[in-house]
Amino acid sequence: MHPRTVVYLEHDGKLLLVDESGNGPKDCIMGRNTNEVWLRFPTLEEVEYLGITWTAGRETDLRFGNETYTVLHGEPEIDWPEHWTWKDKVVSDNAVHPVAREAVYRSLHRLVSKVIIRNDKNEILMAKVERGFFKGYWGLPGGYMNH
């Protein structure tokens, strides 16, 4: 049975996921198609056991049928979570519990650029992504945002 309250820890586009026994961090596999759910967000106790300190943010209640789950959003106080999974991988791996997939989906920003910087040659300022899921791709300057 999935825990009623879980913790959504995100750092630079990476998320902490655990297996059904609370062991982690675990990675997602994009496009995985299985009938078994193996991965989920950790509980408060599991985050504490992993020795991760974090700053609490907002809470989100998600309803699935007659069940309500509380997702506690927070920012981990760590450097780079190298072994955590990429946020972008979570939504396409159905071994991830629907609570985690829905929480990630709701956290995705639909941004519209209001400003584009052009030079005298009418060229647009672009930035090449240096790390992360979109490493090597070009886009408008920016980065991951929390809300």
Predicted regions mapped to residue ranges:
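Conserved N-terminal beta-strand and adjoining loop/helix that marks the start
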Residues: M1-L17, R101-I124, P141
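Acidic, metal-coordinating catalytic segment for phosphate/diphosphate chemistry
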Residues: M1-R4, G65-K114
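Hydrophobic transmembrane signal anchors and adjacent membrane-proximal interface regions, especially
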Residues: L9, V37-L39, Y49, L62, ...
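Conserved Nudix-box catalytic region and its N-terminal flanking loop in Nudix hydrolases
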Residues: H11-L50, E123-H147
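A residue-identity detector for tryptophan
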Residues: W38, W54, W80, W84-W86, ...
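Alpha-helix initiation/capping motif
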Residues: F41-L44, H97, I117
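Mid-chain, well-packed structural core segment of small domains
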Residues: Y49-H73
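Beta-hairpin (beta-strand-turn-beta-strand) motif
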Residues: G74-E75, D120, V129
